[in-house]
Curated annotation (Swiss-Prot):
Residues reported in the UniProt entry to bind iron-sulfur cluster: C71, C190, C277
Organism: Escherichia coli O6:H1 (strain CFT073 / ATCC 700928 / UPEC)
Full protein name: L(+)-tartrate dehydratase subunit alpha
Organism domain of life: Bacteria
Induction comment: Induced by tartrate, via TtdR.
Family: Belongs to the class-I fumarase family.
Gene: ttdA
Cofactors that this protein relies on: iron-sulfur cluster
Keywords: 4Fe-4S, Iron, Iron-sulfur, Lyase, Metal-binding
Reaction catalysed by this enzyme: (2R,3R)-tartrate = oxaloacetate + H2O
Coiled coil location: none
Phylogenetic placement of the source organism: Bacteria, Pseudomonadati, Pseudomonadota, Gammaproteobacteria, Enterobacterales
Amino acid sequence: MMSESNKQQAVNKLTEIVANFTAMISTRMPDDVVDKLKQLKDAETSSMGKIIYHTMFDNMQKAIDLNRPACQDTGEIMFFVKVGSRFPLLGELQSILKQAVEEATVKAPLRHNAVEIFDEVNTGKNTGSGVPWVTWDIVPDGDDAEIEVYMAGGGCTLPGRSKVLMPSEGYEGVVKFVFENISTLAVNACPPVLVGVGIATSVETAAVLSRKAILRPIGSRHPNPKAAELELRLEEGLNRLGIGPQGLTGNSSVMGVHIESAARHPSTIGVAVSTGCWAHRRGTLRVHADLTFENLSHTRSAL
């Protein structure tokens, strides 16, 4: 068991690790996002689309060179944590994440995006009531922590929708719901977007799953072959809309479509859509019990 002084040192160390990682992902896109954007850029045939993709890559390089966020909207910080029950700082992790966000806000710097409901006052720290939002997944007997950080920008959050369908609407209803939302709303979400689809029983379970879907590496597939096929068919169909980069038409509309699902009630089909913009700022950090860590999402970037 750690002494109090050793535990405080460990808390300070992990806070610094998470703060540095959070600041870094505001500046640098994850490897899979950069690779996908390059693929779409190389495949683009419209002159306007080519100009926009060139501007995106110029923007990404300037963000690195100047060590500044790649987009001025650095979002509301969310954490999706998969942590072992024997991780030595499990009890302190919630407060560590909050402190890390406040430190990253100064280091990056991050735009102040936490406004208290009803009071309508910006806290100026990117923390507040229920913020940063943390979703927990406790792994029995594990001693690692896998921390996924997501910056939920305003533009890419606005298209988010959730609905409960009648079972008679079937998977055709799911497809219709996805197309209605992306075709009408994604144009203002800084496309090409990454589309997350959650399918479950209720609006809240589907919504959480849709958000988790956009945290997966681009191009990863659902383990169920039928779901994986639907991911590909949705991606192909949405790209035919020709929304293009920044909504100004082009060959592609989306970077990908990911589906996450849970068993549903026989009488309902809950479906939700979440989107990530082209500057999809998310990162995955694995921290071991001895506080050594692995940067899983940005292997080309050192902390």
